[in-house]
Amino acid sequence: MAPRQSKTAKRSKVQNKTRTVESEVGSDSAARNLLMSQPKLTPKSIVKAPSKAAVKKQQAKIRLYGARSGKEYREDQLDIPALNKAITPGVKAKKGKKGKKFVEDNDALTLNRLVKSINDKYDQANESKLEKSRRLDEIRELKKQELERKEEQKENKLEGKKNEVKSKASLARANRRKSAKSQKNEESKAASNKGKKSVSFA
């Protein structure tokens, strides 16, 4: 059995209760209904409407200098050069459309390939499977020829460089031989001049 509490203990227990503030909206249904019927009050706008004098002044300016264009440009659209930026020497930033490839006028192979591949989008609606496969084969063949030509150009360039290096080396070798020969001749002349005795008659 629990021990009996004294009157003072009971009183202190009741007095030390924490008070809670409960809103009427939660407890009172009438208050809740009143709140729901209230219109939504929007805060006053901070932007003031211009005065008549200010409007007149603005219109006078427009008449004098013309209206400003409403379009506002960002910094990246204005193409302003960036300051305090480290510029790497010898590297030029590419401008314009990326992936632009120019074809030479006399390059019939590439032109044919491009024409055939461009028509691919528009011709597929009214062509049979056989025609399509034939055309795709043609495009593949043209691409293969282009690759072969590129490889050939690479090989030719490499061969040209090799020949250039070889010719430079042979030229240097020939120069070295010439200089060595001329040096030997000079030495032999000097030695023969030393061995001869000159006699002068008075």
Swiss-Prot record:
Keyword Coiled coil: yes
Record's keyword terms, sorted: Coiled coil, mRNA transport, Nucleus, Ribosome biogenesis, Transport
Disulphide bridges: none
Disordered: region residues: 1-43, 145-202
Compartment list: Nucleus, Nucleolus
One GO biological process term: intracellular mRNA localization
Recorded coiled-coil stretches: 111-176
Biased amino acid composition, Basic and acidic residues: 145-167
Biased composition (Basic residues): 7-16
Superkingdom, natural source: Eukaryota
Keyword Cell membrane: no
Molecular function per GO: mRNA binding
GO cellular component term of the entry, any: nucleolus
Subunit and partners: Component of the 66S pre-ribosomal particle.
Record-stated family: Belongs to the LOC1 family.
Function (record text): Required for efficient assembly and nuclear export of the 60S ribosomal subunit.
The protein's name: 60S ribosomal subunit assembly/export protein LOC1
Organism annotation: Debaryomyces hansenii (strain ATCC 36239 / CBS 767 / BCRC 21394 / JCM 1990 / NBRC 0083 / IGC 2968)
